[in-house]
Amino acid sequence: MLRLIKQPLFRCASSGHLMKESLVFIHQTRTFQVGKFTSNEKYNEKIEDINERSNPQWDNAGLENLLNQLQDSVEQSASDDFMGELEKKIEVENEEPPLMGTNLWPSPSSSIVGLIDRPFQVDSTVQHLVNLIMRDGKKAKAEKIVATALSIIQKETGENPIDVLKQAIAEISPLMKLVSAKRFNKSVEFPMPLKERQRRRIALQWILGECKSSSPKRLSDRIVKEIIAIRSKTSNCFKKKDHLHRMCLVNRGNAPVRI
């Protein structure tokens, strides 16, 4: 009997306690939702206030004033850039042109020392001659020899020495050379055309070869003597050129035919 009576009383007490806890929980959730709703409203109001402050409403007069200021600043910067470019162009036009052609070398009456001390114009033909004269990497010495020779040529001819040198090289430069090859266990020679640099190299080698057997002591004087001999058609370089061309004509039958 005691067990039967205690059990329903325990159940009623436990059920009443659960109902009380559930009511308290519901009340707390409602108050939390109401507080959350109010806090969300305050947050939205703050966001709207910040947006209004960061994005102020411009009236038409303010916008026009701002656009005018921007346009004036752009026009001023563009005008400054244009004036700067114009001043640069004027400075470039007013600069003196570099020494070219006949202005490269001084008059024949001037001294040789001043010409040797200053660097002469870089020309492919002159540099080729300097490189062929150079020994043991002493390029400054070779440049001094060539500059002295060119200054003497100018004094004797009264013309631009570089043009005189190029003309002399063009007169003695060959058009072809002989190349040897083996055919059927037999060495034959056949002509091959030369490029411009190859022709110039052979001509300069012939000039320097003739300078070895000349009488003047200085190499610059011997170069001048050989170039003047080429201008007067009395140099042995013409004989070398004619002999090479004659041998090329004799061996023209051995030239390979390429289809």
UniProtKB/Swiss-Prot annotation:
Keywords carried by this UniProt record: Mitochondrion, Phosphoprotein, Ribonucleoprotein, Ribosomal protein, Transit peptide
CDD domains hit by this protein: uS7_Mitochondria_Fungi (cd14868)
Predominant location: mitochondrion
Any GO molecular function: rRNA binding
Subcellular location(s) per record: Mitochondrion
GO cellular component: mitochondrial small ribosomal subunit; mitochondrion; ribosome
Domain of life: Eukaryota
Gene3D superfamilies found in the cross-reference section: Ribosomal protein S7 domain
Any single biological process term in GO: translation
Transit peptide limits: 1-39
InterPro entries, per the entry: Ribosomal_uS7, Ribosomal_uS7_CS, Ribosomal_uS7_dom, Ribosomal_uS7_dom_sf, Ribosomal_uS7m_fungi
Sites bearing Phosphothreonine, chain numbering: 157
Cystine pairings recorded for this chain: none
Entry's family note: Belongs to the universal ribosomal protein uS7 family.
Purpose: Component of the mitochondrial ribosome (mitoribosome), a dedicated translation machinery responsible for the synthesis of mitochondrial genome-encoded proteins, including at least some of the essential transmembrane subunits of the mitochondrial respiratory chain. The mitoribosomes are attached to the mitochondrial inner membrane and translation products are cotranslationally integrated into the membrane.
Subunit structure and binding partners: Component of the mitochondrial small ribosomal subunit (mt-SSU). Mature yeast 74S mitochondrial ribosomes consist of a small (37S) and a large (54S) subunit. The 37S small subunit contains a 15S ribosomal RNA (15S mt-rRNA) and at least 32 different proteins. The 54S large subunit contains a 21S rRNA (21S mt-rRNA) and at least 45 different proteins.
Name assigned to this protein: Small ribosomal subunit protein uS7m
Organism: Schizosaccharomyces pombe (strain 972 / ATCC 24843)
